[in-house]
Amino acid sequence: MNTKERKTVEKMLVAFNTNFAMQDEVKVRKIKEKFLKNFTVDVTKNPQYVIQLLETAFSEKNAGDVDESLAIGFMFELFSESFSDILRKLIEADWHFTHEDIASIFQELKLPETVECLYKAALKQFEYLEYDEFFALAVKCIWALGAIKTDAAKEKLKLLARSDNEIISRNALAQLERM
């Protein structure tokens, strides 16, 4: 992501966060229009560009660019199966801070190929989440596994249900009951 793109994303995020509480669809639409006018590529017509931004951020280990690229994806609802490869790599990487966002994307996409990385992420202790006594990332990964509903997802939930961590175990059992 170049400097101009970063500034455009940052302006969009500031404007969106400032106006978000109002839930004003007109203002949100204007923010999106202004972003598309000023950004290098019309991401609504070329979501592959956001994948490229994520791949570059991954190879450069640029946490800020991962965060901002995901923000573009969320703002314009771009996430699809085509994002799977890069997001699977990112959810296992330990140098950024957007694991929960990626787990939420996987929950929406319900892709069987994400089962293994979701399971690993549910168990991984990322340094920046050491304070999280509620294990939000693990819970989001468990809910994503529950949404996938394949035999492989069910097997991973069974393993998680045997966890010594009560929060992980309880959430995995709840997802198994829903399946």
Question: Whereabouts are the PLM-identified features?
Answer:
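Intrinsically disordered, serine/threonine- and proline-rich low-complexity regions
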Residues: 1-52, 77
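Amphipathic alpha-helical scaffolding segments comprising HEAT/armadillo-like alpha-solenoid repeats
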Residues: 3-11, 44-57, 78-93, 111-127, ...
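Generic secondary-structure transition motif, activating predominantly at the C-termini of alpha-helices
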Residues: 17-20, 39, 54, 58-62, ...
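Structural detector for internal amphipathic alpha-helices that build alpha-solenoid repeat scaffolds
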Residues: 26-44, 56, 60-79, 89, ...
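A short, hydrophobic/aromatic-rich structural module that often spans a beta strand
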Residues: 155-179
